[in-house]
Amino acid sequence: MESAAGEEGKAAPSLPLATLIGRELRGGGSERPLVRYGHFGFAKRGEDYFLVKPDCLRVPGDPSSAFSVFAVFDGHNGVSAAVFSKEHLLEHVMSAVPQGIGRDDWLQALPRALVAGFVKTDIDFQRKGEASGTTATLVVVDGFTVTVASVGDSRCILDTQGGVISLLTVDHRLEENVEERERVTASGGEVSRLNLCGGQEVGPLRCWPGGLCLSRSIGDTDVGEFIVPIPHVKQVKLSNAGGRLIIASDGIWDALSSEAAAQACRGLPAELAAKLVVKQALKTSGLKDDTTCVVVDIIPSDHSSTPPSLSPKKNQNKLRSLLFGRRSHSSVGKLGNKSASFDSVEELFEEGSAMLDERLGRNFPSKANSSPSRCAICQVDQAPFEDLVTDNGGGCCSAPSTPWVGPYLCSDCRKKKDAMEGKRSSRSTACR
């Protein structure tokens, strides 16, 4: 790299101290991290699916706009909803983000685009008239920024180099989520266990009609409208030390705690880590359900591709265990000695409301915006000033020249919104 000091007869220009400090702080994250991943699973019913797209581009042909996407879909009552979501969810999310915006605006727009994409996927699948459903956990990695959207109970955790484990999803199981139980009953659903002859209750809490154990999913046309596809969304920025994501179906999490899953695979490369997590779950509980695990390592570009959490000797112990079926008690990695400031995770956004107008905005567009607007769900262009729901709160997501005041909801999709919120039936009102 050439510098002004290397040119004879020219003095380096003086810069304010604040500018130099700012450059130094930004410089630590200027190089994009390496993303390494692995996946593994065993099938019992064959209803788990996953998605791995490590080389996506926001702007075709522009490598600086690269991002990666990883997802797990745990289907139930058949595979149709899981397959449909795997094939269409990312497309619908990206179509809800306008072209031509910069990276900062894209990251700000992403949480709302994820909501719109999940709902669009649900509406399109319900048009097929099939009764299956699926969980969905979609993870977008852009540099050191991680955005996770989820419905159901396919959990995603973050394990940092300092050994701190963070949960990036919320389980939408009625048995464990009090807020979701209250929402379902307030919307007209009944929450109870299965009743055997004689009135004995068995099994986990379920919502009726339908008997689903989850309060949020994609699909499930045969259950009440209070089962919604609106995801919990969380966005975090990792420190320059990076971290490891573990995304898995409940076949893993019913057997292992978040801590056990993270500790089971520390120090191994992602592909072997995913295999070891699945093996540990099977060792703990047996093959009771489909088990799928995706491990994603976000690694500083100046580090090796293996997370430096364990010494080489302990790595060898883990590898022997994986290959030969035995694991030393000493193979569990010790927490690193990184300082909290070096390994901190900054929370940028978190929202889990099931109310669409809270997630996409509830105001009308300003009259200054005279261009046609596109419904965030059905992706149909609307005439100016047509009945829309939008966020017009100061253009938090803006293109370089004019503010972007979307996403919008057309009147048909607002009917679907009202139905999901328990205000009316939507059997004939899904957007066309």
Swiss-Prot record:
Organism superkingdom: Eukaryota
Cofactor note: Binds 2 magnesium or manganese ions per subunit.
E.C. designation(s): 3.1.3.16
Any Pfam family: PP2C
Matching Gene3D superfamilies: PPM-type phosphatase domain
GO terms assigned for molecular function: metal ion binding; protein serine/threonine phosphatase activity
Keywords, ordered alphabetically: Hydrolase, Magnesium, Manganese, Metal-binding, Protein phosphatase
Cofactor(s) named in the record: Mg(2+); Mn(2+)
Binding-site positions, Mn(2+) 2: D74, D250, D289
Segments forming domain PPM-type phosphatase: 27-298
GO BP of this protein: regulation of intracellular signal transduction
The keyword ATP-binding is annotated on this UniProt entry: no
Catalytic activity: O-phospho-L-seryl-[protein] + H2O = L-seryl-[protein] + phosphate; O-phospho-L-threonyl-[protein] + H2O = L-threonyl-[protein] + phosphate
Top-level EC class as recorded in UniProt: hydrolase
Family listed: Belongs to the PP2C family.
Protein name in the entry: Probable protein phosphatase 2C 33
Species of provenance: Oryza sativa subsp. japonica (Rice)
Classification lineage: Eukaryota, Viridiplantae, Streptophyta, Embryophyta, Tracheophyta
